[in-house]
Design a protein with these regions (language model features):
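Short peripheral tails and domain-boundary helices/loops at the edges of structured domains
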Residues: 188, 284-292, 431-443
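Gly/Pro-biased beta-strand-loop elements
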Residues: 267-374
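Acidic, low-complexity Ser/Thr/Gly/Pro-rich repeat segments typical of extracellular/periplasmic
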Residues: 2-31, 36-282, 309
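Soluble periplasmic/extracytoplasmic beta-strand elements of cell-envelope proteins
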Residues: 93, 109-111, 121, 155, ...
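Pocket-edge structural micro-motifs
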Residues: 96, 114, 223, 243, ...
Length: 443
């Protein structure tokens, strides 16, 4: 192996070093001095690096006790305080939550605390139609003037100001409960009507009700007469209410419908919330005797008038039982084909017709029959006929009885050769005993 010989006159040539070698301090050996180990060199290097890092961190972070940059914390806190100081005290609440898909059609409204509402705008999202409403006199609330539609998307913007004039705004977009997921009960009689003593409260629901107890318990019917009123279910979609005996003449009946949010069955919820009142008029109960072909009208318990009639023929007798007038028509068409008598009659202008059953029993004027049949023989297909004129003019028994009758008056048929009318065929639940009626209640 080649050896390099050095001397003062012949210095050693410079040796090339690797980058790693350049980083290492030259090792010198001092005679008599302890030899440094590789571990010591590494320790010194790490210590030096740590010190440099500490200096760098100190330079970046600064002295915590010195003034200067605070990472923006004090500035942000000041901005937050200013924003809080400028925020309105008016807090707006919208009853229908933003994004809701099953909002009530009745309870939509706006309330504010710490201020007053200045304006509220509710629109149907698809059509842009504005829903009219009104802010309360004290400015604390707003309600729409009409019931909202089912299954409709709405947008609401409400603005208010506090006592210092600072504004607040609240927005909400929501969709009302769909018709597929809700139920409605069509009811009779209507609010404000005056009806006869036999008029029940009758609900017909547009969906099958399986949760009958909850639905019935959220409909309260009461009378100023103090009579006990009980509900009775006919199947799963009809619920009627009546007292044990006919309503007291002159009394006021009130029904409170609180079905909004009530579960009627799987996947269906009620949406109605309202109070309805109607008045019971004078008492009028008319009794038709098929043996004599006469009808006796009693007004407030006293005989008022007797009228000759022509009831059902022997082939088509009239139902027996208590029947309630449910509809009145100055003139109507009666077509036999609609009730199983196809081709036997089709009279387009029957005068003074009043419905007694949903299957087609009426008490009505008759201008086509001979005057001799009234009070003597039954000639109809099951209706009760009264002498009348074509067009309904003149002074006739048919016209008189029509004018003297109310929806809800009772017509009792007796001594007919037919069966008693079914209690759910029309508004004829009076044909059930009180015990049987109460047995049909779900409450």
């Amino acid at each position: 192996m080649e050896q390099l010989v050095t001397s003062p006159d012949n210095p050693a040539p410079a040796r090339s070093r690797t980058p790693h070698q350049l980083l290492q301090p030259a090792e010198q050996t001092v005679p008599g001095a302890p030899r440094r180990t590789r571990r010591m060199r590494r320790t010194l290097a790490v210590t030096a690096l740590f010190a440099a890092g500490a200096l760098a961190l100190t330079a970046c972070g600064g002295d915590a006790s010195a003034g200067g940059n605070d990472d923006g914390k004090n500035g942000q806190a000041g901005a937050d305080a200013a924003a809080k100081k400028d925020a309105s005290d008016a807090k707006i609440q919208v009853s229908s939550k933003d994004g809701a898909t099953d909002a009530s059609i009745n309870d939509t409204g706006v309330k504010v605390t710490g201020g007053k509402l200045t304006d509220v705008k509710l629109t149907a999202a698809d059509s842009g139609a504005v829903i009219a409403g009104a802010i309360s006199a004290d400015g604390s609330s707003w309600k729409p003037g009409v019931q909202l539609e089912r299954g409709t998307k709405y947008k609401l913007v409400a603005n208010a100001k506090d006592a210092k004039g600072r504004s607040a705004t609240e927005n909400a977009t929501f969709t009302t409960v769909s018709s597929a997921n809700s139920f409605i009960g069509s009811y009779t009689p209507d609010d404000g009507k005056t009806v006869g003593v036999g008029m029940p409260v009758s609900f017909n629901f547009d969906k099958v009700i399986s949760n009958k107890k909850d639905v019935q318990s959220h409909i309260k019917v009461s009378s100023s007469s103090g009579q006990e009123v009980v509900g009775h279910w006919f199947g799963s979609q009809r619920l009627d209410f009546r007292p044990e005996d006919y309503w007291k003449a002159g009394s006021k009946v009130t029904m409170k419908i609180d079905l909004d949010g009530v579960k009627g069955g799987a996947g269906i919820t009620g949406v109605q919330s309202k109070t309805v009142s109607f008045t019971i008029g004078r008492s009028q109960v008319s009794t038709v005797d098929m043996n004599t072909q006469q009808m006796t009208i009693k007004r407030d318990g006293k005989t008022y008038k007797t009228i000759p009639i022509s009831g059902g023929s022997p082939q088509h007798p009239t139902y027996n039982g208590q029947m309630v007038i449910s509809e009145k028509f100055e003139q109507t068409r009666m077509d036999g084909s609609t009730v199983g008598f196809g081709g036997e009659y089709d009279i387009k202008d029957v005068p003074h017709a009043m419905r007694l059953s949903s299957s087609g029993t009426f008490i009505h004027g008759n201008y086509w029959g001979s005057s001799s049949v009234f009070g003597n023989s039954g000639t109809s297909h099951g209706c009760v006929g009264l002498r009348d004129n074509k067009g309904g003019g003149g002074d006739t028994p048919g016209k008189w009885f029509f004018n003297e009758s109310l929806v809800g008056d009772v017509v009792i048929v007796k001594n007919s050769h037919d069966k008693t009318v079914q209690p759910d065929n029309g508004l004829n639940g009076w044909n059930l005993s009180w015990s049987d009626w109460k047995a049909g209640s779900a409450v």
